[in-house]
Amino acid sequence: MKTRKHTLALMAFFIGVTNVFAQIEGDKIFKNTQILTIELTFHQTSFFDSLEANYLTAEYMKADLVLTDSTGTYSYPEVGVRLKGNSTYNHPNNKKAFKIDFNEYVSGQKHDGIKKLNFSNNFKDPSMMREKVFFDVCKAAGVLVPRSNFANVYFNGTLWGFYTVVEQIDDQFLDWAILDDDGNLFKAGDNFGGSNTPADLVYYGSTASDYTDRYELKTNEDVNDMTDLIDFMDFVNNSTSANFESQLFNKMELNEYLRSVALDNMFSNFDSYTGSARNYYMYHNMSTDKWEWVKWDGNEAFGSYPAGGGGGPGGGGNNVLTIDPDYHDADRPLLENIFASTSLYHAYLLEYCDILENYFNSSYIDPIIDSHYNLIKSSVYADNNKMYTDADFDNNISSNVSSGSGPGGGTIYGLKSFISSRVSYLEGEIDCDDIVSVEDMDKVENLELFPNPASEQITLKWENGVGLDIKILDSKGVLVYQNNPEYINSLNVDVDSWATGIYHLVFTSSNGTAKSQTFSILR
C-alpha cells in the first residue's frame, strides 16, 4: 500500500532547509499543542447582554486583550469581539462561541501575523477535543484544514470557559498553506435551519444571484466575480461522463480532495459537503488554475451529526458506525460523479485505504487523544460553564455518554470506541489488499493515439499507469506539451494551433517505463 505525502509536508521541509529562521505566521499560537490564556476586558456595562444583542448582526464590540502563549504575554488594546456559531449558540450557558479580530479597531494590529481567531465552545462534546483531534489527523494525512489549539478564556477577570482555538481561513492561511492568495476564496453558506440553500455545487444557471445565498466570496470582494466558481459547477453538472473523468484533475487538486472526502466519511463528519453541504471553503489557486478544498468546523466529527437523520445510537436513520465509504446525501453532484466513474472511484479507494492504514486507526489516533487528555484535564475540570460533568469528560474519551433531551442531548460516541468500531466495520467492507496499489499500476499498456494524422485534436488512451509524465515534442525536439495526469485513462489534447509536421509523444510512468509514438499534423 502506498503512502502519500502532502505537498505541505515537502514545502515545510524545503522552507526549513533554505531558511531555518523562517517562521509561518501564527506559529506562536499553533505550532505546539498548548493551552493559551485569553483575558478580555470589556468596558461596557452589561457587556454580555450587548454581545448577545449584536449576535444576529455580527457586530463587533471593543475589548482589551491580554494573550499568553508559550512564547510570552502580549497586550492588545481595543480588539473586536463578537459571538458566532449556529447550533453552537444553543449552548445552555453563557459560554458561546466567539471571534476576536485584532484589526477591527486598530488598523494593522495582529498577533504573530494573525488578524482573527475563532473560539469554539465544544458544544455537544463531552471530550472537549473532538474538533482538535479531527483537524490534527486531517492535517497529518495531507488535507487542508485550519490549525487549532486550546485556550482558557477570561471575561473581565472571570473564567468563562475552556475553548478550542481555530485559525481563520483568510489570506494569512492561504499564504502559508497554499502559497497563493490572489485567487477567489469562497465559503460555503451556512444553510442553517433548513433554509434550502445548501452549498451543494449544483448548477442553477449562469447568474451570480442564483448562488449568493449559497457561497460567500471572502477575497477580491471589490471585484465580486463568481464566474470561476459558476464555471466549475457547470463543468461538474453538465460535462459528459468521459469529459468529467478526464478533466477533473485539471480543475481541482484531486488527490487532496479525495483524501478530504475519505476523512469525512471515516470520522462520520456529516456536517460537511457529504451531508449538510456546508462547512467548507473552495479556493481558486491562480498559480495552478485548480480549485483547492479546505475543511471547516469539525466539532461534530466522530458521528455527532446524523447521516440522513437519526444516525446516533438508537436513532432511526443511518447508523454512523456502519456508513459505507461511498455514502453521501442526495444532490451532491461532485461526489455522485466521482463515485460513478470507475477510475475516479478506484482512485478514491486508493486514498481511503492509505488513510485507513496509516492514520485512521487506534494505533495512530489513541496516543493523540491521550496526549490531549493529559494536557487539558485540569482546565476542563475548572470550566464551570461546560455542558457536561467532569465524569462525562473522563468517560467520553473511551465510552459513549448519554444526557437528556434538548440541545446537546442524546448519546455522544466515545472517541476511542468510535474509532475502534468504525475501523472494524470498514475493514469488513473494504479489502484493501484487493485495491491495486500504485506499484501494480505503474506499467502503461495498450497506448493509443488517434486520429493520426490529426488537424484539430488528438485523443490519447491507455491502460494502467500512475505517476505519468506525458510529453510531446516537435520534429526539432522542442517541448510543445506536457501533462501529469492522475487517475484517468484518456486525454484530449487540442493541436489546432500547432504547426503542421511530425511530433513525438513520450509516455513515462513512475517506475521509469517509457512508451513513445510518432504522429503528424496535416491540414
Region spans (language model):
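C-terminal outer-membrane/trafficking sorting elements
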Residues: 18-21, 441-450, 454-523
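Short beta-strand/loop motifs in extracellular/secreted proteins, especially
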Residues: 61-63, 96-98, 149, 466-470
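Bacterial Sec-dependent N-terminal signal peptides
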Residues: 1-24, 438, 523
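Short, well-structured beta-strand/strand-turn elements
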Residues: 141-152, 272
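A conserved alpha-helical element in kinase catalytic cores
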Residues: 123-143
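Middle-to-C-terminal accessory/interaction subdomains
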Residues: 24-29, 33-36, 46, 55, ...
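Internal "kinase-insert"/substrate-recognition segments embedded within catalytic cores
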Residues: 97-107, 121-122, 141-146, 158-267, ...
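Conserved oxyanion/phosphate-binding beta-strand-loop segments in alpha/beta enzyme cores
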Residues: 63-121
